[in-house]
């Protein structure tokens, strides 16, 4: 889609340099943008560019921006300005790049602007700004994923709306978890959202490509996979669920088929951005069987049928029945969701309906945001704007209920023994190294949910970041758990552990 990529006037090519060049990188926005950053970094490394850890010594900087809500736009513009001040050579990519006039108005000296998911375009600008002899670096391209059928020497490049890309082998997350993006773009027309305008309609990856990426990650030591898309439950719709090869079998591009195969690999598999479609029941059954983590991240947004209709959101009036059915299938299911309060037209009656839904559904993890206009969103034109002070008052009331429910639900876990994946150490100065740990249960995603604060006890110094331990929960508060390690079982995935992304 040519119209989706806008660039400034191309700079004249400098003379070829055989020395390696250093590129700084700033990644902003959601996990889906993080995966785009990983793809760009993978290609930079493959072509022989060094990634600078700071502005100092960077020959140019790439800024992967967010352009969704106003604060994110401002953060992106500020980051671009900071990078320009530091290096003078900045390539802008990501969602805000789909609105180049906004960038050029503030920063006319940027070297180039591309849209989102534009690896090839970004790399073209990097080569123009910082040409190097790439002949010596062809061996750094990603090699075949372990488990590929005989005769396949390199992973297939996948088509995107801006060209084709490799699945990333450079990760920006800690080694023990990774985001796996199964689709780009969105087919929904939510009144408050502009993602389809920024990232286009949904484009799903073939199931084989996703599964080979997951296999390679687990072979390299990744223990937790976060499956993401704008609408993960709609994965494969645009492909008409076509089949593709994985280890000699044909696998449909469908969420349930993908979940079955991912579950067979033995890692933690966590589902994000899931809409309550009927086939999600089958995924919940896999959760009950222990094949997929009993966790669903569902963006419900509201509970009033009137407001959901104004938002152009699906599922009005059926949300509670769906949640009850899922919990009957999998009693251990943890549900997280986000909501918007103060949407145009929201009355006190609508808000009370939302609060009652929260009481009835007793969601485990909840986030909420006051509505704010987003440039180009259809909701901006709706009548019945809610005053800012009313939005904030409703937000406070909403979060008070959500916090109480969270406190009650977490208190039910006290006394239980739970699996916890370790994310970091939390030692005091006088502690033996590895005495205090911070991790997450199967019901907690990194960065957005609660944590578990653990005392290692007899296992002090024996537990590493990324280990999965058994812990007895001894206390809780509004959002977090506290306990002690009682066992450190060996992790045994169903994927050969190579310690690197090499050929099996």
UniProtKB/Swiss-Prot annotation:
Domain MTTase N-terminal, first and last residues per copy: 21-131
Q: Which UniProt keywords apply?
A: 4Fe-4S, Cytoplasm, Iron, Iron-sulfur, Metal-binding, S-adenosyl-L-methionine, Transferase
- Quickly give the catalysed reaction: L-aspartate(89)-[ribosomal protein uS12]-hydrogen + (sulfur carrier)-SH + AH2 + 2 S-adenosyl-L-methionine = 3-methylsulfanyl-L-aspartate(89)-[ribosomal protein uS12]-hydrogen + (sulfur carrier)-H + 5'-deoxyadenosine + L-methionine + A + S-adenosyl-L-homocysteine + 2 H(+)
* Alphabetized GO MF terms: 4 iron, 4 sulfur cluster binding; aspartic acid methylthiotransferase activity; metal ion binding; protein methylthiotransferase activity
Q: What is its main location?
A: cytoplasm
Pfam families recorded: Radical_SAM, TRAM_2, UPF0004
- Write down the EC number: 2.8.4.4
The compartments listed are: Cytoplasm
Co-factor: note: Binds 2 [4Fe-4S] clusters. One cluster is coordinated with 3 cysteines and an exchangeable S-adenosyl-L-methionine.
Give disulfide pairs as residue numbers. none
Q: Which residues form the Radical SAM core domain?
A: 172-408
Gene Ontology cellular component terms for the protein in this record: cytosol
Tell me, what does this protein do in biology? Catalyzes the methylthiolation of an aspartic acid residue of ribosomal protein uS12.
Q: Which family does the UniProt entry place this protein in?
A: Belongs to the methylthiotransferase family. RimO subfamily.
UniProt protein name: Ribosomal protein uS12 methylthiotransferase RimO
Instruction: Tell me the organism.
Output: Deinococcus radiodurans (strain ATCC 13939 / DSM 20539 / JCM 16871 / CCUG 27074 / LMG 4051 / NBRC 15346 / NCIMB 9279 / VKM B-1422 / R1)
């Amino acid at each position: 889609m040519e119209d989706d990529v806008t660039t400034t006037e191309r700079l004249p090519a400098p003379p070829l340099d055989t020395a390696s060049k250093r590129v700084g990188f700033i990644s902003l926005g959601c996990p889906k943008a993080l995966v785009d950053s990983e793809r760009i970094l993978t290609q930079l490394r493959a072509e022989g560019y060094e990634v600078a850890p700071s502005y100092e010594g960077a020959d140019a900087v790439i800024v992967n921006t967010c352009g969704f809500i106003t604060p994110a736009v401002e953060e992106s513009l500020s980051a671009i300005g900071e990078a320009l001040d530091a290096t003078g050579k900045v390539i802008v990519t990501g969602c805000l790049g789909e609105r180049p006039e906004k960038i050029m108005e503030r920063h006319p000296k940027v070297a180039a602007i591309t849209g989102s998911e534009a690896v090839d375009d970004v790399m073209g600008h990097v080569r123009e700004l910082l040409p190097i002899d790439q002949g010596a670096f062809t061996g750094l391209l990603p090699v075949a994923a372990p488990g590929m059928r005989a005769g396949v020497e390199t992973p297939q490049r996948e088509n995107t709306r801006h060209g084709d890309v490799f699945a990333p082998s450079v990760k920006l997350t800690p080694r023990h978890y990774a985001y796996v993006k199964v689709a780009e773009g969105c087919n929904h027309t939510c009144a408050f959202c502009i993602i389809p305008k920024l990232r286009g309609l949904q484009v799903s990856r073939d199931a084989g490509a996703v599964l080979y990426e997951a296999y390679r990650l687990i072979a390299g030591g990744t223990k937790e996979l976060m499956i993401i898309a704008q609408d993960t439950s709609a994965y494969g719709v645009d492909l008409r669920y076509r089949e593709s090869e994985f280890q000699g079998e044909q696998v449909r591009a469908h969420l349930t088929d993908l979940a079955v195969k991912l579950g067979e690999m033995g890692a933690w598999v966590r589902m994000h951005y899931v809409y309550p479609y009927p086939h999600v029941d089958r995924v919940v059954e896999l959760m009950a069987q222990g094949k997929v983590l009993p966790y669903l991240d569902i963006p419900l947004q509201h509970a009033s049928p009137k407001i959901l209709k104004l938002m152009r959101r699906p599922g009005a009036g059926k949300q509670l029945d769906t949640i009850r059915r899922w919990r009957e299938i999998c009693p251990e299911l943890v549900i997280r969701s986000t909501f918007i309060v103060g949407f145009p037209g929201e009355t006190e009656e609508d808000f009370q309906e939302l609060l009652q839904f929260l009481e009835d559904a007793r969601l485990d993890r909840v986030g909420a945001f006051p509505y704010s206009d987003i440039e180009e969103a259809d909701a901006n034109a709706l009548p019945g704007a809610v005053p800012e002070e009313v939005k904030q008052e409703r937000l406070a009331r909403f979060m008070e209920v959500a916090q109480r429910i969270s406190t009650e639900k977490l208190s039910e876990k006290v006394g239980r023994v739970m699996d916890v994946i370790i994310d970091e150490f939390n030692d005091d100065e006088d502690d033996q190294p590895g005495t205090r740990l911070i991790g997450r249960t199967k019901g907690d995603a990194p960065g957005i949910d609660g944590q578990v604060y653990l005392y290692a006890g007899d296992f002090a110094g024996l537990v590493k970041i990324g280990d999965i331990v058994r812990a007895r929960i001894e206390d809780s508060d509004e959002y977090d758990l506290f306990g002690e390690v009682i066992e450190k079982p060996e992790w045994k995935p169903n994927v050969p552990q190579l310690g690197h992304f090499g050929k099996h």
